[in-house]
């Protein structure tokens, strides 16, 4: 099999992959859109004691650190809005990325509270405690490393519930502590819960999946338990069946491209993970701790951690085991993860993600050089066998079975592997697709600039210069490669392959196209080096292609 047929095969594989991606989107329709109610959603059925309703009317307080801007409703103490100050909404925008949101068209909130027999949160009748706050605005000052936001609620029996949010500098992990002082004459039985509530349907401004040629990243719920390191639990799963598992430690999360929210209960405690369809187009995933009894005059603290931010793998791994697995590298994660670690290591020296991609391309192609050399050697031997194969076809005629048997006998006698030219292709395709997943899922590469006009390696080239350059390099590889293709139709297909690939690559991330350009340039250099060696062995001639 010669190199041009390899190009045709890689094109077919890539087209098949893109068609499969588009089919995944088209055959997983979103549920029918419903009007979102911000304040009156209550779980029904068996989960009514777990999933909590909306926040209702309360006072909104603002919290700002160096990386987060939050809006907290004093009714329930839920986080109704969260902006990530280090991440612009779009490239070049002065607006920051809004992860949590509460609007008439879309709801995404982080909720927590105390349920149970004596808890101030009562999902059954829609009650949420109305907290008091010392001020309505909290800002992490210069030189300050920690910011605490206390919310206080006093029950009718005099018991005091203080809900404190603890935020730290340069940190997306938020501590949520409940300090309970039982001033009543009877024991208090309480259960700590935390849940993430989100609209199932995306409004247009949040919908980034309109381009069917783009990788469709996962959006939905996920969890980690003592039995499962990482498990996706989609909105469709929530609609079909409520999650209900008991585990020690672990976490529950809502995921989307580049960003995540997650509740992490205490690692040494047993919790119940649950999900619920709340109606009005809302779904939730959360945890509920074991009941805690506080005797009269006794004080206790219950705590959990909330992650609201980008999927920075090393930081997430420090917060909870396996939380870094929320970065959605798809079915090629086992290649994408080490590839990203290598890319990040290179970036620590180079300081530019584009140059890091160039370096990693040289490393990958260098490792694959022995296979590439074997590929070209195999193709050269196959070309030398063409006269014998042609004579064999003329002698045998239409007897396909006999032709196949004699061809295999000839390959064996000449020590030629007819599939030898395919191995580098088979290895390169997973690496290529893994890099695609990595570019589209690693937040470090979001809006990462290269040089000149390339301001975002995770987005397509705005001027299509890189795809055109890629097409030119493919053209030169094609011109320099000997061919045994004699069929006119195949020859026409091969002629248009650079054009076809250029069109495909117009919509691909600039970082991916950059990888392919550099890979093609390395191919040209390796090709010349290998051909010189083959000439000395009499396996290659530098005659011009006709």
UniProtKB/Swiss-Prot annotation:
The chain crosses the membrane at residues 6-26, 344-364, 419-439, 457-477, 498-518. Keywords: Cell inner membrane, Cell membrane, Chaperone, Membrane, Protein transport, Transmembrane, Transmembrane helix, Transport. Residues 30-55 are annotated as: Disordered. The keyword Nuclease does not apply. GO terms for molecular function: membrane insertase activity. InterPro entries: Membr_insert_YidC, Membr_insert_YidC_N, YidC/ALB3/OXA1/COX18, YidC/Oxa/ALB_C, YidC_ALB_C, YidC_periplasmic_sf. CDD domains: 5TM_YidC_Alb3 (cd20070), EcYidC-like_peri (cd19961). It is a multi-pass membrane protein. One of its GO terms (cellular component) is plasma membrane. One of its GO terms (biological process) is protein transport. It is found in: Cell inner membrane. Residues 30-44 have a biased composition (Low complexity). The keyword Chaperone applies. Interacts with the Sec translocase complex via SecD. Specifically interacts with transmembrane segments of nascent integral membrane proteins during membrane integration. Required for the insertion and/or proper folding and/or complex formation of integral membrane proteins into the membrane. Involved in integration of membrane proteins that insert both dependently and independently of the Sec translocase complex, as well as at least some lipoproteins. Aids folding of multispanning membrane proteins. Belongs to the OXA1/ALB3/YidC family. Type 1 subfamily. HAMAP family: YidC_type1 (MF_01810). This is Membrane protein insertase YidC. The gene is yidC.
